[in-house]
């Protein structure tokens, strides 16, 4: 009998120019176009059941894999995503993001991902994640950080433009 170990634990770290609040704002933006920030979350699967000030219950996914997640960002510099339902993940599956302000003004993001397969497909995906899939997930994470940074810069540019136009009208 062949057994596939069903839990994968993956850990990434990255520095960003974003503040923790800016990253959390991107992470918890469940509007259309979420896939522009998170490649593994398409509008087709996105369903927001509850969105509060510091928590949300959301289903998201892509390519035939979905999960319902409980987002909790009530603790400063920390966001926990707990899988409450999925077609492949169960058990202790989820994500934990921890943010640390750096003296140079950047933020250190530490993300810990747990994937516990609840069926054969989930266990097989977990095996892939532990081996060749870790690099893919790292790139997806890095792309998300870069997309949120770009979105933040675009917002700042719009604010600068509005302030500039307002100053011109006042003169």
Locations of the language-model features?
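Hydrophobic ligand-binding cavity/cleft-lining segments
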Residues: 1-53, 171
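Short, surface-exposed coil-to-beta transition loops
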Residues: 7-11, 64-69, 90-96
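Short structured motifs
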Residues: 9-10, 54-55, 80-82, 93-98
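A short, structured loop/turn motif at beta-sheet edges
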Residues: 16-21, 51, 72-76, 98-108
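Hydrophobic pocket/interface hotspot
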Residues: 23-27, 71, 81, 109-111, ...
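Glycine-rich portal/gate segments that line the openings of hydrophobic small-molecule binding cavities
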Residues: 35, 42-88, 143, 147, ...
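Beta-strand/loop substructures that line and gate deep hydrophobic ligand-binding cavities in soluble
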Residues: 84-142
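Charge-rich (especially acidic), low-complexity segments
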Residues: 156-171
């Amino acid at each position: 009998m062949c057994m596939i170990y069903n839990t994968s634990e993956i850990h990434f770290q990255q520095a960003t120019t974003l503040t923790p609040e800016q990253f959390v704002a991107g992470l918890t933006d469940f509007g259309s176009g979420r896939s522009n920030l998170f490649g593994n979350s398409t509008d087709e699967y996105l369903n927001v059941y509850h969105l509060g000030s510091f928590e949300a219950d959301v289903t998201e996914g892509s390519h035939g894999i979905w999960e319902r997640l409980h987002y909790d960002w009530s603790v400063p510099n920390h966001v926990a995503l707990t899988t409450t339902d999925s077609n492949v993940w169960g058990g202790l599956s989820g994500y934990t993001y921890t943010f640390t302000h750096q003296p140079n003004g950047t933020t250190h993001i530490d993300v810990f991902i747990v994937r516990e397969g609840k069926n054969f497909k989930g266990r097989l995906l977990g095996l892939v994640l532990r081996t060749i899939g870790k690099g893919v997930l790292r790139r997806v994470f890095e792309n998300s950080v870069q997309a949120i940074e770009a979105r933040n810069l675009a917002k700042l540019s719009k604010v600068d433009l509005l302030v500039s136009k307002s100053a011109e009208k006042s003169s």
